């Protein structure tokens, strides 16, 4: 299944806010933000073509394995005879010809889907789906149609337009295990084609009979296929109407306790789609009781499971403080620490940092929990040394923590070394991240100023000195000429507030050079040509 078939247009909350409250600081995911799935995996999940099985894997009705692709051309030569068999009134010829078509459509590479469609047999296969008296023929026809629907959108459209979808939904109640399983697979392929096709399948009432396949008596192959199809029912943008997919939540809560990696993977992806949205959707996911197990799965050895579990947790903490607290209370912070500090791939670390950034956008108790879990030090390490995509997310995590944190929490973060890497990112190419880092530094400077006012630091803003020592002052000065007006204005404001007064105090009384700089908050303030320079 493709995670990004349609461009998400959601903008990060709190793009350039000066003061960040918990709601503003949380950020929904952007489409291009976390590239965590290989295209091969995306494609195989969106649609699956049923290929030939070994003799010991064949379902009850599959009489023989698939021919080698080298015989395809020879098979196509006999296409007229196969078509004749399909349209015959002879039951055995119908089955034999349909089976030949199924084999042809099941070859490993480039099956001749277009040629089969052009042969005009699709309506006949759909008709065969209704043959309750002949489940073996139903099965072969369903398999052939499944593989046609695994092709292009145009191929899928042909299957839909010949009326197969409502019949496949009816076949979910078939007496035959194999027919039911093939119907599940076919519906997964149709739903996986596009949100429009997904909604068509849901509109035919497919969800409830699909969920009934997920029982304790189901074979593993059925569990895998039904869970995969369920994930396709939940996938895609625009999202399906939540009321249509909400009934899947109790089943997903059971499925994430499976020991099978494929079932776990697709169940977690389904939860990641359902939790990607408004707080009421997030609340429904929480109330389904999935959070404890999702947190456990953050330590799963397989990235295929870990990634969608992390995505789900990350989505949940975009909710309100209570929803975020549910994740914290179930021990997610220690798992996130492990993801930051162990040798996980870039995409996982990036996703973990994004998740933490939404936790640090919470209240002070939640920021304290992040500090006590030991997350600040590894965040600083990533902020300093990781690839830029990870640095960006770590910068959000630190900046959000400074926005909502107490003075003591900010002092702790400074002690952990946040100042230098924040300063270093002021020269990065991303204006949003420059702004995020400026906000973080400004929040730190405010605490330093408060300490200075109380006389605790000998009339010196110790944090301003730290920023200067980290070459941050020079970088802030240079931002006065930045193309982005918000960055320029913020840089000027920081320089006015935390360095100009210091410069003024060093000038001798009556020094004429002080006359043009009336910046004490008056409206007549003017920035000197070229900006401030305090070096």
UniProtKB/Swiss-Prot annotation:
Disruption phenotype: The impa1 impa2 double mutant exhibits root growth inhibition under salt stress and reduced NLS-mediated import of nuclear proteins. Salt-hypersensitivity is exacerbated in plants lacking also SWO1. Keywords: Nucleus, Protein transport, Repeat, Transport. One of its GO terms (molecular function) is nuclear import signal receptor activity. Pfam families: Arm, Arm_3, IBB. InterPro entries: ARM-like, ARM-type_fold, Arm_3, Armadillo, Importin-a_IBB, Importin-a_IBB_sf, Importin_alpha. Disulfide bonds: none annotated. Residues 20-46 have a biased composition (Basic and acidic residues). Residues 1-58 form the IBB domain. It is found in: Nucleus envelope. Gene3D superfamilies: Importin-alpha, importin-beta-binding domain, Leucine-rich Repeat Variant. Residues 20-67 are annotated as: Disordered. GO terms for biological process: cell wall organization; NLS-bearing protein import into nucleus; regulation of root development; response to salt stress. GO terms for cellular component: cytosol; nuclear envelope; nucleolus; plasmodesma. ARM repeats lie at residues 67-106, 110-150, 153-192, 195-235, 237-276, 279-318, 321-361, 364-403, 407-446, 461-500. Belongs to the importin alpha family. Binds to conventional NLS motifs and mediates nuclear protein import across the nuclear envelope. Involved in the maintenance of cell wall integrity under salt stress via interaction with SWO1. Acts as a cellular receptor for the nuclear import of the virD2 protein of Agrobacterium, but is not essential for Agrobacterium-mediated root transformation. Forms a complex with the importin subunit beta-1 KPNB1. Interacts with A.tumefaciens VirD2 and VirE2. Binds to SWO1. This is Importin subunit alpha-2. The gene is IMPA2.
